[in-house]
Swiss-Prot record:
HAMAP family: NadE_ammonia_dep. InterPro entries: NAD/GMP_synthase (IPR022310), NAD_synthase (IPR003694), NH(3)-dep_NAD(+)_synth (IPR022926), Rossmann-like_a/b/a_fold (IPR014729). Keywords: ATP-binding, Ligase, Magnesium, Metal-binding, NAD, Nucleotide-binding. ATP binds at residues 45-52, 158, 187, 209. The keyword Transit peptide does not apply. This is NH(3)-dependent NAD(+) synthetase. It catalyses: deamido-NAD(+) + NH4(+) + ATP = AMP + diphosphate + NAD(+) + H(+).
Length: 272
């Protein structure tokens, strides 16, 4: 088995999918898991990007089906901007599409800035822009877990195969969640699910960005990665890609393995 095939298997990627069937499987997963845990629903941060829009709509469909079947479940969508978000219109469009039971807005700027200032005062140096970006991601997850804890809700994560293969997420930030309904999907497969669900094309054709850096606001994921999502998707779907691209992907996969594992102990062997 080639490394490419091993990665596809490890990340549960199918080269060809039926969007309608995938929607059904993922809604059923959300329903089954929330019932098993005894939780009362879900909470998810909504950025206006493809991934949170898709995960949010799946979550809302799941809780509506649970209620229609006589159960009790709710979904809270959370806007988590740092000051003013330049693509706020897209975030609002996503909320309109998702139709969450409840939506709230929580500006993380005061919390992040207070922490950054305290860090500088105590340690005598400023956080790097990259490190501060990770703080933003972790504060967002702290907020979601606070809302989830208050309301007995599970926190949904938006990780999918194209992020997982590169480790392109913040450990214990957007990478920290209770369940991942997009696991195994490539970026283009996620777009196909949103198309099937009737989303406005603005929500899945826009340039993907983590938008965590103050010094490079709105920087494209592909710029930061040095790899395009089409290249990642082709690789993950078993297609041939240029050798240098495959090497970049495989290197990122190898060095980011720790991000796809629970905290290491001396009894684990994945890191050896």
């Amino acid at each position: 088995m080639t490394l490419q095939e091993q990665i596809m298997k490890a990340l549960h990627v199918q080269p060809v999918i039926d969007p309608k069937a995938e929607i059904r499987k993922r809604v059923d997963f959300l329903k089954d898991y929330v019932k098993k845990t005894g939780a009362k629903g879900f909470v998810l941060g909504i950025s206006g990007g493809q991934d949170s829009t898709l995960a949010g709509r799946l979550a809302q469909l799941a809780v509506e089906e649970i209620r229609n079947e006589g159960g009790n479940a709710t979904f809270i969508a959370v806007r988590l901007p740092y000051k003013v978000q330049k693509d706020e219109d897209d975030a609002q469009l996503a909320l309109q599409f998702i139709q969450a039971d409840q939506s709230v807005a929580f500006d993380i700027a005061s919390t992040v800035d207070a922490f950054s200032n305290q860090y500088e005062n105590l340690l005598g140096e400023s956080l790097t822009d990259f490190n501060k970006g990770n703080v933003k991601a972790r504060i967002r997850m702290v907020t979601q877990y606070a809302i989830g804890g208050q309301n007995s809700l599970l926190v949904i994560g938006t990780d999918h195969a194209a992020e997982a293969v590169t480790g392109f997420f913040t450990k214990f930030g957007d990478g920290g969640a209770d369940l991942l309904p997009l696991t195994g999907l490539t970026k283009r497969q996620g777009r196909a699910l949103l198309q099937e669900l009737g989303a406005d094309e603005r929500l899945y054709l826009k340039m993907p960005t983590a938008d965590l850096l103050d010094e490079k606001p709105g920087q494209a994921d592909e710029t930061e990665l040095g790899i395009t999502y089409d290249q990642l998707d082709d690789y993950l779907e078993g297609k041939a890609v240029p050798t240098d691209v495959a090497e970049k992907i495989e290197k990122r996969y190898t060095v980011s393995e720790h991000k796809r594992q629970v905290p290491a102990s001396m009894f684990d062997d994945w890191w050896k």
